[in-house]
Amino acid sequence: MKAKVLLVDDSALARRSVRQMLEADGYTVVEAEDGMTALERYFLEKPDLVLLDLVMKGMNGLDVLAKLRLMDPAVRVIVVSADVQHSSRELAHGAGASAFVIKPVSRPEILKAVANVLEVIS
């Protein structure tokens, strides 16, 4: 069985789209629609990887990433965002993101990013 992925995005449409891409490739997907739910699901589900939107209502992606790092310094996170600013990419990497993927994501792009990050830990 492939890895378990926690998918965090406040857009139900974005979650559904990425979920379908990942599940079609054999990944198990757990969803969270906001930062607090993401932290709870991470603690309960122990996913191998987190796909994290940067801009969300309430707690933003960088805040979620910081809290995840406190919970688990080895957490693997791919930031998935429509924010194409180079500074956003730098902030995400500086906060500990393993990769950064720009929305809208394509199936090959997201699967490659997930496989690359998971390969590093296997």
Ranges and model annotations:
Residues 16-24, 90:
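Charged docking surfaces used in two-component/phosphorelay signaling
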Residues 26-33, 41:
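Short hydrophobic/Thr-rich beta-strand motif most characteristic of the beta2 strand and flanking loop
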Residues 34-37, 60-63:
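Acidic catalytic/metal-coordinating carboxylates
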Residues 50, 54-55:
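The short loop immediately C-terminal to the conserved phospho-acceptor aspartate in CheY-like receiver
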Residues 57-58, 85:
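The feature encodes the CheY-like receiver
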Residues 63, 84-99, 112:
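Alpha4 helix (beta4-alpha4-beta5 surface) of REC/receiver domains from two-component response regulators
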Residues 105-114:
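C-terminal output helix
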